[in-house]
Amino acid sequence: MIRWTREAARIAAVAVLSIGMVTALTTPTALDAQTLDALSPQVREFVSFENDQVLIRNVTLIDGTGAPAQRGASVLIDGDRISAVAPAGTELPVSPGTRIFDGSGQTLIPGLVMLHEHMFYPSGQARYNTNEQSFPPLYLAGGVTTMRTGGSVDPYSDLSTRRLIEAGRIPGPHMDVTGPYLEGPGGFIRSFPQLATPEQAVAHVNFWMDQGATSFKAYNLITRETLGAGIEAAHARGAKVTGHLCSITYQEAADLGIDNLEHGFFAATDWVQDKEPDQCPRGQDLRYLDLDLDAPEFTDVVDHLIESGVALTSTLTVVERRASGRPAPPYGAQQAMLPELHESVMARVERNAQREDNPATALLHRYMEMEKAFYDRGGFLVVGTDPTGGGDVVPGYANQRAIQLLIEMGLTVEEAVEVSTKNGAIYLGQDDEIGTIEAGKRADLVLINGDVTTDIEQFRRMRIAF
């Protein structure tokens, strides 16, 4: 759980302690083109400035398309739109009163589009608490301007949070909200529905779409028949379905028409020997270490997903926390934790540091290899953080870390930004509005106080989220 006091709010939304971010809502991010007067005092507290026109010049531009970074570029913002993007040496005409930023030594990227986020956090004993006050500003301060919740335990709260953000009452990113999980009987989390029949899945999807949900997520124990009915119902109403699956293999899910699969290949049961249909075989993680990633056993699954148009969500941030030799959460993230959670997290970091035979370390590297193989074969990769696990994946901070892990996995800086921005926008069907820095698109941008092309630690120094 995250503290939400006035002091913690500043740590969350302005991050003054460690990463030096200021959340600036010029023509407010996630608040459309509202004026400052239309915003609540809670939002105005985090607005750095308001101008009709903003020019960022002489900046290193990573535009989200995967193209090489452009040095000395300029970007002009009019209202809530990007009106011009110019290469080095080009002067863009501006109006009197334009706010001008000298971007020397800084990087401009599109606002992050993250697809496995939550408004809840683990509290032990299979219980999850909602954090609708602290999480939205944390995400925005971490550069996330659009997010999809990767499952909901309190959907009415999530839907209300989205409405409050859109109305300018609280700071936060645009939200694509999943309904409650599509889970089968026997699920271990008390707040999840347990859908036993196709009819129940259809009713579930239709009810929550009527309430405003725009996506759905299937979970471990659902059967193929029930999931297939849920997918069909969601598609009939223009919604997509993702899954953290176990009882259903990735190939089976692709055949059912699923749009997305979570956690890379962490949850795949395609390679479990003698797997029973519609049954979840637990404790099989080490099977990944024996896979030959060049053999048909693996490549056939990958190719089937690609041919079926299934996106894969990388969530290496939550996997990393189990491994040894990994950095502790940054200072600001630690400060946002309750004292008892912080104590538990740091004790686990210390234990992991002393383990030389930790299988989670080898698994982390294997998951990276599998995701990179999927990407290299033409798979559509998106990214999220999954702020659950042991409680040390903190929104905002983890989103910055997610980009770094994609680069560690083998992507270039430009490719990692593309996966974290454009690909998410494409998946959500919003790439005509967001995801890349192009004239005419919404000005969802993040200015970073450093050059990420030479030092990826600079992703921690997000200065302004537009």
Where are these regions (language model features)?
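Bacterial N-terminal signal peptides
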Residues: 12-26
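Active-site neighborhoods of metal-dependent hydrolases
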Residues: 204-217, 222, 267-409
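Histidine-rich, glycine-flanked metal-binding segment
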Residues: 38-41, 46-52, 61, 67-109
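Divalent metal-coordination and catalytic microenvironments
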Residues: 59, 75, 80, 105, ...
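N-terminal secretory signal peptides that target proteins for export/translocation
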Residues: 1-7
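Divalent metal-dependent hydrolysis catalytic cores, especially in the metallo-beta-lactamase
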Residues: 135-156, 173-180, 210-222, 231, ...
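Metal-associated gating/positioning segment near the N- to mid-region
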Residues: 106-169, 185-188, 193, 199, ...
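Acidic, glycine-enriched loop/beta-strand segments at the rims
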Residues: 43-48, 61-74, 87-90, 394, ...
